[in-house]
């Protein structure tokens, strides 16, 4: 076997630990070269020049024919993310390129972020004597279903909507019911477009198509169905919400809105940011456990591709965690010790210059983010 060349997004956790000759089962005469590149700098010319065997990415890198047309060496693409809207999987299949993504890697991280945001803005919902909060969840995959479990633990009622799944205890409502009857609506859907979408002139078309498209799922019409008192949280994909419609809605209703993702990310307009109750730089999934789990999953998949047994587990790299959900949910005063979401909000707002947060500053906040811990369920 020839030496293995890997081009990797430099923001993927623990690259050195997982992607070295010993961890990948290579013999001592073979080398594993890991070339670290900022995710937005992985381009067609770079891949044509380097001709890597393996490409490890995050959601900021678009994988499609335009990127790989002049590369004939890549045999494996791994995305250390849950979402796949940045990857043209049909094209990879045509090229016989193996693809793996980190399904479920950050489900606890994101769900815990949402709970933290809710209880920071509406701490009264800690009280069991309160009328139970009704939490609407749109999208009941790995993250949405995990959030539903935490909500149940807190005694909250869940209204869930996912047209792609069978009816269940949590998939129990229509979109209309979720919008109209919830105290808080949290979005956990992939970014998808109509199957007949005309991509000509589209600013940012996804690589996913669906009978239930989610681009601008939250728009002027759907916002109008929601009570002004209903909080809206988006930690899924920015373009799921029409940003212009959202600004107009907040102006009219003073709605509490929490955004971790933005339609025109990585640039964020101050006009939107100033209206949000909480805004963070796409870090809902940024826990030590979530990041390591993402790396672990694509490492395991690459080992399978190379026909070697994985020899490293993320648990070998994790320090002791003292945050237990069983204790935290009974002691609300520990919430800020676990995660002060307002610090991340302040850090993002402090980057406003000339009426916006620049893309480079947004990316820097993500790159330099001090990974928090998940609480142990």
Swiss-Prot record:
Gene this protein is translated from: pdxB
Positions contributing to substrate binding: 59, 81, 286
Single GO MF annotation: protein dimerization activity
Binding site for NAD(+): 162, 260, 285
Family assignment from sequence similarity: Belongs to the D-isomer specific 2-hydroxyacid dehydrogenase family. PdxB subfamily.
Species the sequence originates in: Psychrobacter arcticus (strain DSM 17307 / VKM B-2377 / 273-4)
Protein name per UniProt: Erythronate-4-phosphate dehydrogenase
Top-level taxonomic group: Bacteria
Taxonomic lineage of the native organism: Bacteria, Pseudomonadati, Pseudomonadota, Gammaproteobacteria, Moraxellales
GO cellular component, one term: cytoplasm
Catalytic activity, reaction form: 4-phospho-D-erythronate + NAD(+) = (R)-3-hydroxy-2-oxo-4-phosphooxybutanoate + NADH + H(+)
Subunit record text: Homodimer.
Entry keyword annotation includes Oxidoreductase: yes
């Amino acid at each position: 076997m020839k030496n293995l060349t890997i081009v990797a997004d430099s923001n993927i956790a623990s690259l050195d630990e997982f992607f070295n000759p010993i961890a990948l089962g290579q013999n001592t005469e073979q080398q594993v070269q890991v070339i670290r590149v900022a995710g937005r700098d992985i381009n067609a010319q770079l891949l044509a020049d380097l001709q890597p065997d393996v490409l490890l990415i995050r959601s900021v890198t678009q994988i499609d024919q335009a990127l790989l047309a002049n590369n004939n060496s890549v045999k494996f693409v791994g995305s250390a993310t849950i979402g796949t809207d940045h990857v043209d999987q049909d094209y990879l299949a045509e090229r016989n390129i193996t693809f793996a993504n980190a399904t479920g890697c950050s489900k606890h991280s994101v769900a815990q972020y949402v709970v933290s945001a809710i209880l920071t803005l509406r701490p009264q919902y800690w009280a069991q004597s309160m009328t139970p909060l009704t939490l609407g969840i749109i999208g009941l995959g790995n993250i949405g279903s995990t959030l539903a479990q935490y909500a149940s633990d807190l005694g909250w009622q869940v209204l869930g909507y996912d047209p792609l799944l069978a009816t269940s205890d949590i998939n129990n409502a229509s979109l209309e019911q979720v919008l109209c009857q919830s105290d808080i609506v949290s979005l956990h859907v992939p970014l998808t477009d109509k199957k007949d979408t005309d991509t000509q002139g589209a600013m940012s078309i996804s690589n996913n198509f669906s009978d239930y498209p989610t681009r601008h799922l939250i728009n002027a019409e759907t916002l109008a169905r929601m009570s002004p008192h209903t909080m809206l949280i988006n930690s899924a994909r920015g373009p799921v919400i029409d940003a212009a419609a959202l600004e107009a809605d907040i102006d009219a209703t003073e709605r509490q809105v929490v955004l971790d993702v933005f339609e025109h990310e990585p640039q964020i307009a101050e006009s939107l940011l100033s209206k949000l109750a909480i805004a963070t730089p796409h870090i809902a999934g940024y826990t030590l456990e979530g990041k390591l789990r993402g790396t672990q999953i694509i490492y395991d998949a690459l080992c399978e591709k190379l026909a070697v047994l994985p020899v490293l587990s993320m648990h070998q790299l994790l320090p002791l965690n003292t945050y237990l959900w069983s204790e935290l949910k009974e002691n609300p005063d520990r919430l800020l010790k676990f995660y002060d979401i307002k610090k991340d909000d302040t850090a993002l707002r402090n980057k406003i210059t000339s009426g916006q947060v620049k893309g480079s500053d947004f990316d820097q906040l993500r790159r330099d983010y001090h990974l928090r811990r998940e609480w142990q369920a």
